Amino acid sequence: MDVVVYAPASIGNVSVGFDVLGAAVSPVDGTLLGDRVMVKAGDEPFSLKTAGSFVSKLPTETKENIVYDCWVVFSRELDKKGISVKSLEMTLEKNMPIGSGLGSSACSIVAALDALNRFHGQPLNETELLALMGEMEGKISGGIHYDNVAPCYLGGVQLMLEELGIISQEVPCFDDWYWVMAYPGIKVSTAEAREILPSQYRRQDVIAHGRHLAGFIHACHSGQPELAAKMIKDVIAEPYREKLLPGFADARKYATSAGALATGISGSGPTLFSICKEQDVAERVARWLEQNYVQNEEGFVHVCRLDKQGSIVTGSEL
């Protein structure tokens, strides 16, 4: 049966958890901030169509598209189980800017693999599918990591564990927080953002990082939103990556003065997130970011909430 899966935007790192924390977000106004993938029966083993507002940024060659790679690894896994892959046609609706720090590649990967799995009657379980998603993310960024694909697929705030067969688990967070997401419209490559980081860190930074991350997780589990927000600090990446983001320091300064609880870089940037407790504060911060952080017509600002669902079926037609 034909299926369409939507996969939401995500915040890698959430400042405090470099490479081990991620959060899925969705705009409060119902805008779909994420990619959709449709899978339906086809005449050939595989064919791909593309659509969406950022379709022009995709490779023109089918075999260079990550959705094709998803089909290849999904077929490989089904072959191991003695299951044949159906002839199918996939359509990627690319609604997410590439190199934005919003988990754009994760959106395509999660929507594609989830849709393929559902189209075939879900032969792969959640952990098997998530492992494939991490493998595909690694193909793009150069190393397997789950801090975008896990929240995008499973929803909420996810902590990467990768032990005892557990890839990630959800961290209880605060449903009343507003997450203002501001994408300036420029591109920052994940590879460049990683190269700028030091190969070694000072002991006091390592201690501070451990305190902040442990404190954040503890505050989430014990229901202390003010403490959790105070712990959202990054000594690992943001001090070095700020120089790649024009206007970030000013934006954080304004957001703090306007009443935001915390502001940080989403993933490797250039998108920033700002957490606010009150909607009027979130809207004030959003207006300022639209006027001062967004640099061109491709940029945007959304007031979001945590997306607790992750990837979902939205029907059978795009």
From Swiss-Prot:
Cited InterPro entries: GHMP_kinase_C_dom, GHMP_kinase_C_sf, GHMP_kinase_N_dom, GHMP_knse_ATP-bd_CS, Homoserine_kinase, Ribosomal_Su5_D2-typ_SF, Ribsml_uS5_D2-typ_fold_subgr
Any GO BP: threonine biosynthetic process
Main subcellular localisation: cytoplasm
Subcellular location: Cytoplasm
EC code(s) of this entry: 2.7.1.39
MF annotations from Gene Ontology: ATP binding; homoserine kinase activity
Domain of life: Bacteria
Coiled coil location: none
Stored NCBIfam families: PRK01212.1-4 (NF002288), thrB (TIGR00191)
Name by which UniProt lists this protein: Homoserine kinase
Species: Vibrio atlanticus (strain LGP32)
